Curated annotation (Swiss-Prot):
Pfam families, sorted: Hormone_recep (PF00104), zf-C4 (PF00105)
Region (Disordered): 1-21
NR LBD domain boundaries: 336-560
Organism in which the protein naturally occurs: Caenorhabditis elegans
Keywords: DNA-binding, Metal-binding, Nucleus, Receptor, Transcription, Transcription regulation, Zinc, Zinc-finger
DNA-binding region extent: 23-98
Keyword Membrane: no
Matching SMART domains: HOLI (SM00430), ZnF_C4 (SM00399)
Cellular location(s): Nucleus
Molecular functions (GO terms): nuclear receptor activity; RNA polymerase II cis-regulatory region sequence-specific DNA binding; zinc ion binding
Name the UniProt record assigns to this protein: Nuclear hormone receptor family member nhr-8
Length: 560
């Protein structure tokens, strides 16, 4: 007597597929679908994801609020919400169990592909890597030819030199490319950094030759020595030797004198726009950022940022408030320096304005939208500084492209609230958006989370809470003299020297000579640490879907 309930195979044969939407869109992530998988129209990625994780439904937990928006760009950020959506749209895990014993079908699949196996080895490797993603339990079957290829590759003797030739035309065809082994590997944070250093060894035209092995003091060669806070001369500061730099003993009990951990002597060089693109290809998945070389183009996104002086739109009472803040430094700073400090406060006011649009601070997507709006304001602020506008347009481009991440991080230091471990942003008239640092606790962001937490914990609280000092420090970060391909690096040196000179004068005025010396040394160390945190931030940007990024960020990262 037949069973009252049809078998799984019978139900699958008799089931009539629902009408497909136009364009075959994945019902889970809205990516392009390839067919019906487990009863639902999905893409290949969601099919593989469901096959790997359907049995782990109770084990995977959402690190946020179980309400993450799942799109083709954000689907990798939260496995729990993605799996919940798979079940919600009707994907059936029973079909998964029914498919596993059918090894003959799998064997037949590879058998049919055997004639083209040699030509499709690369495709098969890519497919195998995708199947292995987040999978340490299932058994994987691979074609024999592919297995032999992988074994032979693993047993290959490593070459002692590179015989590659440049194909893009950047180097002469006769240029011999060789691997580069850094002398001090302590400055390299990960295997990705090592390969990145190897790949960029010959890009001398993009690095300043003086950035190979530098200590914090020699990195900022234009910074005044802390033991001499009188009679500054900018032209002397630019060429001042760092060997005479001394600080007072670190026994003074104050939060401002807390020195950061000992920094390695090698300084991570700033990345040029060309090196941004190379790093993107090496740090991100191949299917994310496999783009042709960036063509020459005009600087439209950054040029489009408003350049109307903020002073024309500020109310008079706000200018009076700024003057009242900085009047105490009259006599400490000279007239030109007072003008520069006033300008920093004026240009900083738009950054204090509430955000225009609400974004969910508990989701990764919302956090990146906040970052996009903040970056737009930060770039606008930098473009309006008088000393910045005196530079050649190419130097302005290179400084912004190389330093936008560091400016964002410094702005985050100013907005950070240590009491509840969050960044606070105002919204509307009395609204507030509080972004918890914990939102960065994500497998994709783990490296940046650790580096950022180290910076937050070692940055002096007294300095971080002093708006005058942070604005000057922020300006000094903008004018980084070791950015490659600068037309007038001496002008950038001297400009940064002015801001470091102001910084040391204010530290001495606020805290006294001894404490100022130690605080100043700590800030120079933090500049080096800032570059390391910036590298981890860039890797986060390179792992995102560029189609979802703001045009300004795409331009800054040389994605287009």
């Amino acid at each position: 007597m037949p069973s009252s309930s049809p078998s799984m195979d019978e139900s699958r044969r008799s089931a009539v597929p629902p009408k497909e939407p136009a364009g075959r869109i994945c019902t889970v992530c809205s990516d392009r679908a390839n067919g019906y998988n487990f009863g639902v129209l999905t893409c290949e990625s969601c099919k593989a994801f469901f096959r790997r994780n359907a049995s782990k439904h109770k084990e995977i937990k959402c690190p946020f609020s179980d309400s993450c928006q799942i799109t083709s760009a954000s689907r990798k950020f939260c496995q729990a919400c993605r799996l919940n959506k798979c079940f919600a749209v009707g994907m059936n895990s029973e079909w998964l169990n029914d498919l596993k014993p059918k090894s003959s079908i799998v064997s037949g699949k590879f058998k049919r592909k055997k004639p083209d196996m040699k030509n499709n080895l690369k495709v098969e490797v890519d497919d195998t890597e995708e199947d292995l993603e987040n999978d340490d339990e299932e058994q994987i079957s691979v074609p024999k030819a592919l297995l032999e290829k992988l074994i032979n590759k693993a047993n290959e003797k490593s070459k002692d030199r590179c015989t590659c030739k440049c194909q893009c035309g950047f180097y002469p065809i006769t240029q011999r490319l060789t691997a580069y082994e850094p002398k001090d590997t302590t400055a390299v944070n990960s295997p990705q950094d090592i390969s990145f250093s190897h790949h960029l060894h010959h890009s001398d035209s993009f690095y300043s030759s003086s950035t190979s092995t530098l200590s914090p003091m020699s990195v900022i060669s234009c910074a005044p020595s802390s033991h001499d806070s009188s009679g500054y001369n900018t032209s002397q500061l630019v060429t001042q030797s760092p060997t005479n730099y001394t600080v007072s003993p670190a026994s003074i009990p104050s939060s401002i004198t807390e020195l950061s951990p000992q920094m390695p002597s090698q300084y991570p060089p700033m990345l040029s726009p060309f090196q941004f693109g190379v790093m993107a290809q090496m740090a991100a998945p191949a299917n994310f950022l496999n783009f042709p070389p960036m063509p020459e183009r005009t600087w439209t996104p950054i040029q489009a940022v408003s350049t109307v002086p903020v002073t024309e739109t500020l109310p008079p009472n706000l200018l009076e408030q700024i003057h009242s803040k900085i009047d105490k430094y009259i006599g400490v700073l000279n007239e030109d320096e007072i003008t520069l400090l006033e300008e920093l406060h004026v240009q900083n006011e738009p950054l204090n304005a509430p955000l225009i649009q609400w974004h969910n601070p508990k989701s990764i997507d919302g956090v990146f939208r906040i970052i996009e709006e903040a970056l737009r304001r930060i770039v606008n602020m930098a473009c309006q500084l008088s000393l910045f506008r005196e530079l050649h347009v190419d130097d302005r481009k290179n400084l912004l492209k190389s330093g936008f991440g560091e400016l964002l991080i410094v702005r985050g230091l100013m907005a950070y609230d240590k009491s509840d471990n969050s960044w606070n942003h105002s919204f509307g008239v009395r609204g507030k958006m509080e972004v918890k640092v914990e939102v960065l606790k994500n497998p994709k962001l783990e490296e940046h989370y650790k580096a950022h937490m180290n910076l937050l914990s070692t940055f002096g609280e007294d300095v971080r809470n002093n708006e005058h000092l942070m604005l000057i420090f922020n300006a000094a970060v903008i004018f980084h003299p070791h950015v490659s391909n600068l037309r007038d690096s001496k002008r950038v040196h001297s400009t940064q020297a002015k801001y470091f000179q102001m910084l040391l004068k204010l530290l001495t005025f606020e805290y006294g000579k001894s404490r100022a010396d130690i605080a100043y040394s700590n800030l120079l160390n933090q500049v080096v640490e800032l570059h390391r945190v910036n590298r981890t931030l860039l890797r986060v940007f390179y792992g995102l879907d560029i189609a979802q990024l703001d045009p300004l960020i795409r331009e800054l990262c040389s994605f287009e």
